[in-house]
Structure formats: structure tokens, C-alpha cells
């Protein structure tokens, strides 16, 4: 009886091993398929070349890169060499007709504005007076010469 049990155990082990071998081959074939598919995709996108940005895509990219600063369509003075400025290349020339990277896009961003400092009350000029106070002051001084008579208003 013990021999039969051991034989049945060996038979189950053998069948289980064969099942695992088939399963391993199936898994490895699937992995090779996906690996080949990934390589094919990467190769075809690299052969396609760099992309260009035109129209709304260019504006969206500039808004993303520059954020709240805003951007210019032509380079502000002071960017690049003097020979480049003579050609008057703009963002469309550089990123629509050719490909450009993020650094090139960032060159067209407006400069960062320094935060406005709050002025103290002492530093304010008399012209900074609110309009209502100015009008009252003007009314009082524009009454003219009434002599010493007091008029109620």
C-alpha cells in the first residue's frame, strides 16, 4: 500500500512539474513579446525625430514654462549674442520651423517682477491722499474771498 501512495505522490509531483514548465514557457514568451513591443515603440519614436511646437501647442507650452510671468514672441533685448539679434528670430522660427527644448522656451519668458514693498504712511506723498479727502480740501480752499462772513453749507 505504501508503494502505491508513493507512486501516486510521484505521479502528482511529475504532473505538477510539467504544468509549471509549460506555465514558465508561456510567461517567458509573453515577456519577450512585450519587451519586443517596447523596443519597437522606442525605436520608431527615436527615428521620427524631435517634435516641433506650433500654434496653440506653442502657446500652451510657453504658458506652462513661464507661468505667471508671461512671455514674449520675440526675444527681449539682452538675450543671446548681437549677431542673433540682427536676424530677429522669434519663438515661431525657433520652435515651430525647428525643434526646441525647454531652455529655449524659457528664454522667451518675461523677467520675474520683484515684489512691491509696502510703503510706510510717512513715506507717502500728499498726492497719495485718497480722492474723497482731496475733494473736501479743494472745496474748502475754493470758497474764495467772502470777507469775514461765515456761510453755512
Curated annotation (Swiss-Prot):
Q: Which domain of life is it from?
A: Eukaryota
- Compositional bias ranges of the Polar residues kind: 139-153
Q: Which UniProt keywords apply?
A: Disulfide bond, Growth factor, Secreted, Signal
Underlying gene: IGF1
Its source organism is Gallus gallus (Chicken)
**A GO BP annotation:** response to insulin-like growth factor stimulus
Name the record gives this protein = Insulin-like growth factor 1
Maturation-removed propeptide residues:
119-153
Q: Which Pfam families match?
A: Insulin
Q: Where in the cell is it found?
A: Secreted
